[in-house]
A protein has these predicted regions:
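A non-catalytic, helix-rich entry segment at domain boundaries
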Residues: 5, 65-153
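Extreme N-terminal basic, low-complexity initiation segments
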Residues: 1-3
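Nuclease catalytic cores
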Residues: 22, 26-77, 118, 122, ...
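Short helix-capping/linker segments at secondary-structure and domain boundaries
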Residues: 47-50, 70-78, 210-216, 282-286
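A residue-level signal for conserved active-site and pocket-lining positions in enzyme catalytic cores
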Residues: 36, 62-63, 171, 204, ...
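Metal-dependent nuclease catalytic regions and adjoining charged, substrate-binding loops involved
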Residues: 24-25, 112, 191-194, 209-306
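Mg2+/Mn2+-dependent nuclease catalytic core
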Residues: 141-250
């Protein structure tokens, strides 16, 4: 957990005022900008237990084992060096076996699907080995790095607002002139996700830059989608960070005005994936759904039968 969490909250309202700051993560900004603003807000203020989904369990397990895989690699540099030497000799099968020995086996209800993701990660890393000379070239300089930062955001009509940014970056690798951020995604890939992924990485690059960590400038960012056999590594662009900051300012303004829009017409399909429809202004019969969720007496909207 972030060291600054006690002084901030995702469920900030104007009544809280200066007692706490607005807290923002990559996920909250992404949900606000690319999915449903109201769902984001309800997920922070309603005491509703989110449903367990297989894809969330798979993602969590694969992330945990991938983190351990790189920890094991750092603890066994001789294995990494052996794999690098074999990569230069074209012994891909041996490279795979060496790296695979460092990766914890998948287990549990979704073991087969999780193992498919993990085996792809090893095959992808075999390709990376061919560009390495020593273990330090292969291993990340940061593995599941936890970041916090306090920044001031200029909000139209409200001036500068101090907020708390949170972030956990899957992996950070060294480049010639700085570092590259790399995310692991166990979901599906589609080209329409490219702007979204750039936005996520821009957020991480910004948080890393303004945090206390000194890993160097972010020169590249990328992502790996094992399920889709897809990965990218792109040059980091300032324009993406500028666009992300504008979305961040809009999110903060929504907090200040307590104004989180429901999905627009034509995007109602998103509601089928929501655990908070009973509290949503688009569907609820209550004028005070959040208060009802927290035990208050219901106030019905005009025209609704009690």
């Amino acid at each position: 957990m972030g060291v600054l969490n006690e002084g901030s909250t995702y469920s900030w309202t104007p009544i809280i005022g200066d007692d706490k700051m607005i807290r923002v993560s990559k996920s909250t900004l992404d949900s606000y900008s690319n999915w449903c603003q109201q769902q984001l807000w309800l997920s922070k203020v309603c005491p509703q237990e989110e449903q367990t989904h297989d894809y969330l369990t798979i993602g969590s397990n694969v992330h945990d084992r991938t983190e351990q895989y790189y920890i094991n690699g750092a603890d066994s540099p001789e294995v990494i060096q052996d794999a690098i030497d074999n990569a230069h000799l074209g012994n891909d099968k041996k490279c795979y076996e060496l790296l695979r020995s460092l990766f914890p086996d998948a287990e549990g209800e979704y073991a087969d699907r999780e193992q498919d993701n993990q085996d792809w990660m090893v095959r992808n890393d075999v390709r990376r080995l061919k560009h390495c000379v020593k273990p330090e070239d292969f291993l990340p300089v940061a593995n599941e790095i936890d970041l916090d930062a306090i920044v001031e955001v200029e909000v139209e009509g409200y001036g500068k607002q101090q907020i708390h940014l949170r972030g956990i970056i899957d992996r950070v690798f060294k480049t010639e002139d700085g570092v590259a951020l790399m995310e692991l995604k166990t979901g599906k890939w589609n080209t329409y996700k490219l702007p979204q992924m750039k936005g996520e990485m821009a957020y991480y690059a910004y948080v890393l830059d303004v945090s206390d960590n000194d890993l160097g400038p972010v020169t590249h960012w990328g992502w790996r989608f094992p399920k889709a056999d897809h990965w990218d590594i792109l040059e980091a662009k300032k324009v993406s960070i500028t666009a992300m900051k504008k979305r961040l300012a809009k999110l903060v303004k929504s907090y200040l005005e307590e104004d989180f829009a429901t999905v627009p017409k034509g995007q109602e399909f998103k509601c089928g994936f929501c655990d908070y429809m009973s509290f949503c202004p688009k569907y609820t019969p209550y004028a005070n759904p959040i208060e009802v969720a927290n035990g208050a007496e219901a106030i019905y909207l005009e025209g609704d039968v009690q």
